[in-house]
Regions:
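Short, solvent-exposed loop/turn elements at beta->coil junctions and helix N-caps
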Residues: 32-36, 131-133
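Short acidic (Asp/Glu) patches
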Residues: 60, 94-98, 126-130
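Short hydrophobic/aromatic beta-strand or adjacent loop that forms the aromatic wall/cage
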Residues: 42, 141-144
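A conserved beta-turn-beta hairpin within the catalytic core of GNAT-like acetyltransferases
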Residues: 63-75, 86
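Short amphipathic alpha-helix that is part of the acyltransferase structural core
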Residues: 1-31, 38-54, 75, 150-167
Length: 167
């Protein structure tokens, strides 16, 4: 059984290990540390199985800058699961739980730069469908948006901006 809960201070080392092992490099783990250090408005969840942290997902503030106005929402990045626990629904539970919490917090959207074959099952669509593009050069099918509040997002198009820690 998978338990999804908010990260706790005792989880920091395990979260770092999950990100390093899942991505095979330090970049994502370092990003998590920088965001945690510089940003108070994060949603950081862990997946626990057999009393072990086996997955992690982080949502951080993002914005979409339109000609008319700027809308504040959240970005999903990174999401990681230990290799030996992949293909067991851990990532899906992390994403679903995170989205539910962001809806509760009234976030109007979530953006993700990720696998085009994975994230649509949660309702993500290419952001280009909404006239929204990333601040970086990325494939249209990999940059996706999940609208959580239609009324807040009505008429919004433009550039999605991540926090400076991402650059």
């Amino acid at each position: 059984m998978i338990e999804i809960r908010d990260e706790q201070p005792k989880d920091m080392e395990a979260i770092r290990e999950v990100n390093v092992r899942a991505f095979g490099q330090m970049q994502e783990a370092d990003l998590v540390d920088k965001l945690r250090q510089n940003c108070d408005d994060l949603l950081s969840l862990v997946a626990v199985m057999q009393n072990k942290v086996v997955g992690h997902i982080l949502f951080s503030p993002a914005s979409i800058k339109s000609k008319a106005r700027t809308v504040q929402g959240m970005a999903l990045a990174p999401m990681a699961v230990l290799p030996e626990f992949q293909q067991r629904g851990v990532g899906s539970e992390l994403v679903r739980t995170g989205i539910a919490e962001l809806k509760r917090r009234l976030s109007p959207f979530v953006i993700v730069l990720g696998h085009a074959g994975y994230y649509p099952r949660f309702g993500f669509q290419p952001a280009a469908v909404y006239g929204i593009r990333s601040e970086w050069e990325v494939p249209d099918d990999a940059f996706m948006l999940l609208v959580l509040d239609e009324s807040e997002m009505r008429g919004i198009s433009g550039v999605a901006l991540y926090r400076p820690e991402f650059t």
